[in-house]
Amino acid sequence: MDANSINSFFLIGALLTAVSVLLSPMSSRLGIPILLIFLAVGILAGEDGPGGILFDDYSTAYLVSNLALAIILLDGGMRTRVASFRVALWPALSLATFGVAITTSITGMMAAWLFDLHWLQGLLVGAIVGSTDAAAVFSLLKGRSLNERVGATLEIESGSNDPMAVFLTVTLIAILANVDTEMSFSFMFISFIKQFGLGICLGLGGGWMLWKLVNLSKLADGLYSILVLSGGLIIYAASNKLGGSGILSIYLVGLFLGNKPTRGRHAILNVLDGMTWVSQIGMFLVLGLLLTPSDLVDILIPGFALAFGMILFARPVAVWISLLPFKSFSSRDRWFISWVGLRGAVPIILAVFPMMAGLPGAQLYFNLAFFVVLVSLLVQGASLTTAARLAKVELPPKPLPVSRSGVEIYPSSEWEVFVYRLSESKWCIGEPLKRLAMPDGTRIAAVFRNDTLLHPSGSTRLEAGDILCVLGQEKSLEALSNLFSQAPENKEVQRFFGDFFIETDVKLADLAPIYGLSLDNLADDMTVADLVVSQLGANPVLGDQFQWQSLHWVVAGLYEGKVTNVGIRLPTEHSL
């Protein structure tokens, strides 16, 4: 490659990236996932688009996509709270294993029938599109206030279900490439255990070693993120090299680092945030360039049938069967999880495997995977907000800091500065500082008004437009959100957690005459906490709801996993 070609490559790459960034606000205006914008830019720049760029290098696309996916999973793992595993680990693992297998089987049978394929070829198509995509799920759920059980299940599932899809895809390719060779059940079982076992061991073990290395190293601030990124990629590559799941390993590395006091953690997260955006843009641009839309014309009708069959039948069946043992999921939770079976880059990456293996019909597998991803992002991604509202899994939004930054007081400091901008509707407007019930371990470090730093006293009253800098830790965010909350915009949001609130140590017998409850002898000694456990199980989450004795009960307060307050919503003529 000469200097002129290199400059042309830089020019085109930078131009496409800049266009993708500038067009990204269209996603919110059009109500479509931002990843679809990046993909569309790549398609328009490609062979059939106005850009006319001819790109058919599957090896390069595979390299770029794997690198990007590794970075995205590392960042996603670092932002996942391990506390969410309390309510979501086993359901997510069930979806990541049994769910993928069931989706693969049903989708595979549909593909074999629709495209007149051998049943093994159909299963290969099902395996390629069988897993949800971490990049798509993390991107679309980011910033949404979902029921913790539902949101955590979707995120953990998307970060851990790729190994199953990879295992099924690689196994089926091996069978199809060697039709005369018998694959024993023991061989496949050992391969499965190897993928997951090595992936988990190297992920957690490598994460611990990298965490120790980061905390023991004395480096320039900007180098910690590079150390974490390179260390994560070493573990990712080593896991793949040894026959494990690199995807699972690097996700667990991020999970370990993100939930331990890590030197330079906030700087690392800031750098990874930018790297994740670059990875998403680069990955979907390259995959968009790889697609020739005219190739999809021949599979248009059966492709739609396959995509909607997977969305409306295969995924829901897989979710309902996989979550059968977990009674804490309501039918609405299951319906929403079924709908958010988003497909993204992973199916397209897996579709490159048959191309590189030289399987007959590999181009069809690739085109089908791309078609399913496009339909999934357009239909499921674009309707996510509506689906969350209909399923009632979205919680009323709580105010988040407009910015937050780490305070590196000592190597593993977990202190941060949270910045809040006060609008007119905040409850605290007009209150003197001394009357603010600040959470333990927090302090207002600075107050800005009209671009001027104030020297406040306890009698200083807060005004609309004030900017508060609060020193605290992440564990105080919930309390700070309540402190700086505002009046709900409408009555429906205002009543979400209930009309009246009671503490969970109150006995039902004391509430019976007030709310007209009919209690038997057994219920006389029950507290509200006992009622919640009997209705929702041992691990309720904020926003969990149940109907009991004509009243609607909502979990309205939690502290360290224990329910502290329950809201009671009285029946109305419009109640469901």
UniProtKB/Swiss-Prot annotation:
K(+)/H(+) antiporter that extrudes potassium in exchange for external protons and maintains the internal concentration of potassium under toxic levels. The lineage of its organism: Bacteria, Pseudomonadati, Pseudomonadota, Gammaproteobacteria, Alteromonadales. It comes from Shewanella baltica (strain OS223). It is a multi-pass membrane protein. GO terms for molecular function: flavin adenine dinucleotide binding; potassium:proton antiporter activity. NCBIfam families: PRK05326.1-1, PRK05326.1-2, PRK05326.1-3. It catalyses: K(+)(in) + H(+)(out) = K(+)(out) + H(+)(in). One of its GO terms (cellular component) is plasma membrane. This is K(+)/H(+) antiporter NhaP2. Belongs to the monovalent cation:proton antiporter 1 (CPA1) transporter (TC 2.A.36) family. NhaP2 subfamily. PANTHER family: K(+)_H(+) ANTIPORTER NHAP2, NA(+)/H(+) ANTIPORTER 1. It comes from the Bacteria.
